[in-house]
Every structure is written in structure tokens, then in C-alpha cells.
């Protein structure tokens, strides 16, 4: 009996950790996430058993059992073995629920979630909050830190309130586009050219623009606002 217990404990200790790797996402950074996912999935140590979960641009969650090579160019979505899935919110039954076409479902136990999503829905605390609700550990920032750091407008306010220096900037709300002359004056009254504008909550360089004069600044403001209701100028 003691030998059986010892072997059982050894088996549990040697069991691979199963990590759900989320990639893709319904954001402007979808393509960048695919390349990140390929890099992560190809580099995980053998002690880790990954479950690849892709999220389409439309927001559909799919369990993907195919080759990681197909993730890079987006062809993974056409794999016939893909099936719908969702993270179980049940803390007593932690895992990924695979939904088969005929309505049947199975649950795959997971130990943690690794979101390699970029931008909206991925780095803004929403996925992290879902995992918190499900009682699953998340690799990376917790939901509060993710939400704060993803919004540069709010992050700068928090840092400034903590007496941490931030680069001089001006933020605008989309409603200020109704008076473009005033919006430009608000920025140029504080900043000198060249001026950069960007959405406050997009990752990478999505919506980022450089302006050398007021005419270019007007176009930059419009371009940045096409991605988010708040922009920041520096």
C-alpha cells in the first residue's frame, strides 16, 4: 500500500503542466499575436503540455490541434480538426470546454492560461479577469495591472499622482474633433513639433502618427481617433 501511494505521488509530481495558450484575438494586433504564439508554442519546454486556443478576428474561440507553422499565416482557422471551445468559469472544474459539432462537450483540465494576445481584449485586463473568475493562474499581469498599463491616459495620471515623472503630453477625447482648431491649439500650446499621436489603448504602433506641422497634425489626430475614443499626443 505504501509503495502504491509513493508511486501515485511520484506520478502526480511528474505529470506535465497543461497550459492553455491563447492567440489571435479580435483586435487590430491579431497578426502580431499569431507570430508571438508561434514563437511561444515552439519554445515551451517538454515539461509543459500546451493547448493552443485561437481566437478569430470575429471573436470566435477555437481549439486548434494542428501544426504551429500554420498559425503564422492565419491558415490555422481552416483546419478541419478545429472545434469551438471556451474557458470553464467553474472554479471546481477548471479547464477548457471543447464543444463538438453535434452538441457534445468535453473538458480538458488546465493548470494555467498564457495569453499571447495583443491589444484590445488581450492586454487590457478582460481575459485576465475571465481567468480570475475561473480560478485559473495567468502568466503575465493580473487584471488590475493589465487594465491600468494598457491605458496610457490613466497610467500617466496614476504615475504623476505618485510623483513619478512622465513625458509631457496632451490627451484628447473624440468629441474634441468637433472643433479641430481648438484641438490643435490645445496640443501645440503645450508641445512643439515634431508631435506624435497615438490611441491610448492600442499596443504596438497601431494608429501611431508623426506630424511636422499643423496640417499633418490634423490628419494624425483623425487617424489615431479611428482606433480609440481617446488619443495621446507627445
PLM features: what roles do these ranges have?
Residues 108, 164, 191:
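Structured loop/turn residues at beta-strand edges in well-structured enzyme cores
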Residues 158-166, 223:
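Basic phosphate/pyrophosphate-binding loop/patch that engages nucleotide-derived ligands
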Residues 165-173, 198:
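Phosphate/pyrophosphate-binding betaalpha-module
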Residues 159-160, 187-208, 229-234:
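ATP-grasp fold ATP-binding core
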Residues 209-234:
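Phosphate-binding site of ATP-dependent enzymes
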Residues 8-144, 148-150, 154, 161, ...:
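ATP-binding N-terminal substructure of ATP-dependent carboxylate-amine bond-forming enzymes
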Amino acid at each position: 500500500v505504501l509503495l502504491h501511494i509513493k508511486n501515485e505521488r511520484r506520478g502526480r509530481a511528474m505529470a506535465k503542466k497543461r497550459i492553455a495558450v491563447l492567440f489571435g484575438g479580435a483586435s487590430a494586433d491579431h497578426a502580431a499575436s499569431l507570430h508571438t504564439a508561434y514563437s511561444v508554442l515552439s519554445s515551451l519546454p517538454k515539461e509543459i503540455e500546451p493547448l493552443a486556443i485561437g481566437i478569430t478576428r470575429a471573436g470566435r474561440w477555437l481549439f486548434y490541434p494542428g501544426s504551429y507553422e500554420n498559425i503564422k499565416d492565419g491558415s490555422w482557422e481552416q483546419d478541419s480538426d478545429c472545434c469551438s471551445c471556451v474557458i470553464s468559469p467553474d472554479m471546481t472544474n477548471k479547464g477548457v470546454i471543447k464543444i463538438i459539432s453535434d452538441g457534445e462537450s468535453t473538458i480538458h483540465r488546465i493548470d494555467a492560461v498564457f495569453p499571447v494576445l495583443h491589444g484590445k481584449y488581450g492586454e487590457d485586463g478582460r481575459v485576465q479577469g475571465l481567468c480570475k473568475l475561473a480560478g485559473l493562474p495567468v502568466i503575465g499581469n493580473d487584471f488590475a495591472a493589465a487594465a491600468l498599463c494598457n491605458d496610457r491616459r490613466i497610467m500617466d495620471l496614476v504615475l504623476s499622482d505618485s510623483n513619478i515623472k512622465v513625458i509631457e503630453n496632451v490627451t484628447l477625447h473624440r468629441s474634441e474633433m468637433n472643433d479641430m482648431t481648438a484641438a490643435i491649439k490645445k496640443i501645440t500650446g503645450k508641445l512643439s513639433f515634431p508631435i506624435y499621436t497615438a490611441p491610448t489603448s492600442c499596443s504596438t504602433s497601431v494608429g501611431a502618427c508623426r506630424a511636422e506641422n499643423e496640417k499633418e497634425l490634423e490628419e494624425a489626430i483623425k487617424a489615431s481617433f479611428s482606433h480609440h475614443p481617446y488619443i495621446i499626443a507627445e
